[in-house]
Amino acid sequence: MAGVNDAIRDSVLFTTADSIISWSRRSALWPETFGIACCAIEMISAGCARYDLDRFGVVFRPSPRQSDVMIIAGTVTRKFAPVVRRLYDQMPEPRWVIAMGTCAISGGVYNTYAVVQGSETFVPVDVHVPGCPPRPEALMHGFLLLQEKIKKSRALTGTPLGRVIAS
């Protein structure tokens, strides 16, 4: 009888629905492909063969309705902020935001009336990737931190976690 119990133990997986849902969400992150400033060049580099974000399950999508991650890569002006918010609202739930670069995080060197001083004023930001511009490795690290955040969140209860800063 011990052989039957060993066979069952080796073929049955015990887990929770939360862990299955968070595994599927973090394994297939689809960021939206739009860039605002020079950080977008580094974002494009991160998707190329040298860095290959596809191996982490990150596949860039052309439409907000097909994506679940928004990368705000660059300076956001007050005139452009409602457009970014509309794109965010068009994304299906659950959705996450990565603020990439100093300009997206705090307005950067542009301390003027026309530039939004931080993306958190119009969308909730989950991960901050600092730098001017941040290297593709920093964006990769930001995606790994986002995956860890998704792993720790409760999918069924919708418990959100705080923001994460990539170093």
Curated annotation (Swiss-Prot):
Under which EC number(s) is this enzyme classified? 7.1.1.-
- For whether the record's keyword set contains Mitochondrion, the answer is no
**Cofactor(s) listed in the protein's UniProt record:** [4Fe-4S] cluster
Catalytic reaction annotation: a quinone + NADH + 5 H(+)(in) = a quinol + NAD(+) + 4 H(+)(out)
The biological processes this protein is annotated with in GO are: aerobic respiration; electron transport coupled proton transport
Q: Which GO terms describe its molecular function?
A: 4 iron, 4 sulfur cluster binding; iron ion binding; NADH dehydrogenase (ubiquinone) activity; NADH:ubiquinone reductase (non-electrogenic) activity; quinone binding
Which HAMAP family does the record cross-reference, listed alphabetically? NDH1_NuoB
Protein family (similarity comment) = Belongs to the complex I 20 kDa subunit family.
Q: What protein am I looking at? A: NADH-quinone oxidoreductase subunit B 2
Organism of this sequence: Rhizobium meliloti (strain 1021) (Ensifer meliloti)
